[in-house]
């Protein structure tokens, strides 16, 4: 039964991918492969949107969908398992029409509703955003400090971080404040992770002292 369910989902996603583009068109592969249900839907959407040169438009529309689904009234209705699927489909159809979403985004939302996959919508949106980030050559970087950085220090930090990038890559920096690290900073850029926090240094010193004693 599980195999049949997966097969059925794959077929429905393929149908969605070709429903708004010419039949038998070659699938456009996204720049990064994401597995799972969200990956299947996001890949189909990326392929269809790429062929119509509407990747950026669909990305903006999906962000709007995410905002709408966070509204208490909408979330209570659409994510409630006791609300009939037909009611959810009608509600979403009205919403996409009101927002004037493209057929690409509207078809995706309707398909998720019809398949009872609305709870997967945030994950699908996240997967598509990841694909778009890689498409733009963005390299995610998170810097955590104990206190806010001044402009001069932040500018210097950006210069250093950009020196690690390859040609065509774009730094996507997020700065977080976490007083618990006590000082220094923690940097995560791409797959690299460097912990230069005072907290970690103190912990290492503490372990070293215990070994000596």
Swiss-Prot record:
Keywords: Acetylation, ATP synthesis, Hydrogen ion transport, Ion transport, Membrane, Mitochondrion, Mitochondrion inner membrane, Transit peptide, Transport, Ubl conjugation
Protein name stated in the entry: ATP synthase peripheral stalk subunit OSCP, mitochondrial
NCBIfam families, sorted: ATP_synt_delta (TIGR01145)
GO molecular function terms listed in the Swiss-Prot or TrEMBL record: proton-transporting ATP synthase activity, rotational mechanism
Cell compartment(s), UniProt: Mitochondrion; Mitochondrion inner membrane
Species for this entry: Bos taurus
Its job: Subunit OSCP, of the mitochondrial membrane ATP synthase complex (F(1)F(0) ATP synthase or Complex V) that produces ATP from ADP in the presence of a proton gradient across the membrane which is generated by electron transport complexes of the respiratory chain. ATP synthase complex consist of a soluble F(1) head domain - the catalytic core - and a membrane F(1) domain - the membrane proton channel. These two domains are linked by a central stalk rotating inside the F(1) region and a stationary peripheral stalk.
InterPro entries to which the protein is assigned, alphabetical: ATP_synth_OSCP/delta_N_sf, ATPase_OSCP/d_CS, ATPase_OSCP/dsu
Modified residues (N6-succinyllysine): 90, 100, 158, 162, 199
N6-acetyllysine modification, residue list: 54, 60, 70, 73, 100, 158, 162, 172, 176, 192
PTM comment: Acetylation at Lys-162 decreases ATP production. Deacetylated by SIRT3. In response to mitochondrial stress, the precursor protein is ubiquitinated by the SIFI complex in the cytoplasm before mitochondrial import, leading to its degradation. Within the SIFI complex, UBR4 initiates ubiquitin chain that are further elongated or branched by KCMF1.
Transit peptide: 1-23
Gene name for this UniProt entry: ATP5PO
Family named by the database record: Belongs to the ATPase delta chain family.
Chain location of the short sequence motif SIFI-degron per the record: 5-23
SUPFAM superfamilies in alphabetical order: N-terminal domain of the delta subunit of the F1F0-ATP synthase
PANTHER family the record matches: ATP SYNTHASE DELTA CHAIN
One GO biological process term: proton motive force-driven mitochondrial ATP synthesis
GO cellular component terms given for this protein: mitochondrial inner membrane; mitochondrion; proton-transporting ATP synthase complex
Subunit architecture: Component of the ATP synthase complex composed at least of ATP5F1A/subunit alpha, ATP5F1B/subunit beta, ATP5MC1/subunit c (homooctomer), MT-ATP6/subunit a, MT-ATP8/subunit 8, ATP5ME/subunit e, ATP5MF/subunit f, ATP5MG/subunit g, ATP5MK/subunit k, ATP5MJ/subunit j, ATP5F1C/subunit gamma, ATP5F1D/subunit delta, ATP5F1E/subunit epsilon, ATP5PF/subunit F6, ATP5PB/subunit b, ATP5PD/subunit d, ATP5PO/subunit OSCP.
């Amino acid at each position: 039964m599980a195999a049949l369910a997966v097969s059925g989902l794959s077929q429905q996603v393929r149908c969605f991918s070709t429903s708004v583009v010419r039949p038998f068109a070659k699938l456009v592969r996204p720049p990064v492969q994401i597995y799972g249900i969200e990956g299947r839907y996001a890949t189909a959407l990326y392929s269809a949107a790429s062929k119509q040169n509407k990747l950026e438009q669909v990305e903006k529309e999906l962000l709007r969908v995410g905002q709408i689904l966070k509204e208490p009234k909408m979330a209570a209705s659409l994510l409630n398992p006791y609300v009939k699927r037909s009611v959810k489909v009608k509600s979403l159809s009205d919403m996409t029409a009101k927002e004037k979403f493209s057929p690409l985004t509207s078809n995706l939302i309707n398909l998720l509703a019809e398949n009872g996959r609305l709870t997967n919508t945030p994950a699908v949106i996240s997967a598509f955003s990841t694909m778009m980030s890689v498409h733009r050559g963005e390299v995610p970087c998170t810097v955590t400090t104990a206190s806010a950085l001044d402009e001069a220090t932040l500018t210097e930090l950006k210069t250093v971080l950009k020196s690690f990038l390859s040609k065509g890559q774009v730094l996507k920096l997020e700065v977080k404040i976490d007083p618990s690290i006590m000082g220094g900073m923690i940097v995560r850029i791409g797959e690299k992770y460097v912990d230069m926090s005072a907290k970690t240094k103190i912990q290492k010193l503490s372990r070293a002292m215990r070994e000596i004693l």
